[in-house]
Amino acid sequence: MEPFTTHTGRAVPLRRSNVDTDQIIPAVYLKRVSRTGFADGLFAAWRQDPGFVLNRPEFAGADILVAGPDFGTGSSREHAVWALQDYGFRVVISPRFGDIFRNNALKGGLLAVVLPESDVEALWDVVESDPATPVTVDLVTREVRYADVVRGFDIDDYTRWRLMEGLDDIGLTLRHADAIDAFEARRPAWKPTTRAS
């Protein structure tokens, strides 16, 4: 997982609320178990509309998604996070997230930032009037900055540390590889092992 400290990019305003994981990536796209190849399924139904925000040329290459309240509700599917990342998003900002989606996002390296709805609406207005507006999401200072605006956000220290170190669950486990090997070496041979034969 790539470490995340500070990211400056352009934002795309998704003025929709109650976006569930099936809208993020429909079930028909869930036939893979790798983390790549999902960009084509991201918001697949909505992208059929030429006027959909991701189809508009002024938002091409934007890597911060600014969504309405209740983003990522519905069924638990890591594929929703993978699709957003595969499309190029590093950050999703919303007033509220589905709990499971937010947990999956943060564990997978996609920063899910909660800002008050009024702050999200103000950010929408700015990026709609000037899509080239740089937006900085600073995990070190826990701030979102754009134009002359600075907004703080909350994130627990442990999750923040994991993101800044670039550690997913596998990365955390691998940090203890020597201790795991030492434990396995001390176990009786007749017990199950995690070591390769």
UniProtKB/Swiss-Prot annotation:
EC number: 4.2.1.33
Associated pathway: Amino-acid biosynthesis; L-leucine biosynthesis; L-leucine from 3-methyl-2-oxobutanoate: step 2/4
GO terms of molecular function: 3-isopropylmalate dehydratase activity
Catalytic activity: (2R,3S)-3-isopropylmalate = (2S)-2-isopropylmalate
Keywords: Amino-acid biosynthesis, Branched-chain amino acid biosynthesis, Leucine biosynthesis, Lyase
Recorded GO CC terms: 3-isopropylmalate dehydratase complex
Top EC category: lyase
One BP term from GO: L-leucine biosynthetic process
CDD domains given in the database record: IPMI_Swivel
Record-linked InterPro entries: 3-IsopropMal_deHydase_ssu, Aconitase/3IPM_dehydase_swvl, AconitaseA/IPMdHydase_ssu_swvl, IPMI_Swivel, LeuD
Biological role stated in the UniProt entry: Catalyzes the isomerization between 2-isopropylmalate and 3-isopropylmalate, via the formation of 2-isopropylmaleate.
Quaternary structure and partners: Heterodimer of LeuC and LeuD.
Protein family per UniProt: Belongs to the LeuD family. LeuD type 1 subfamily.
Protein name in the entry: 3-isopropylmalate dehydratase small subunit
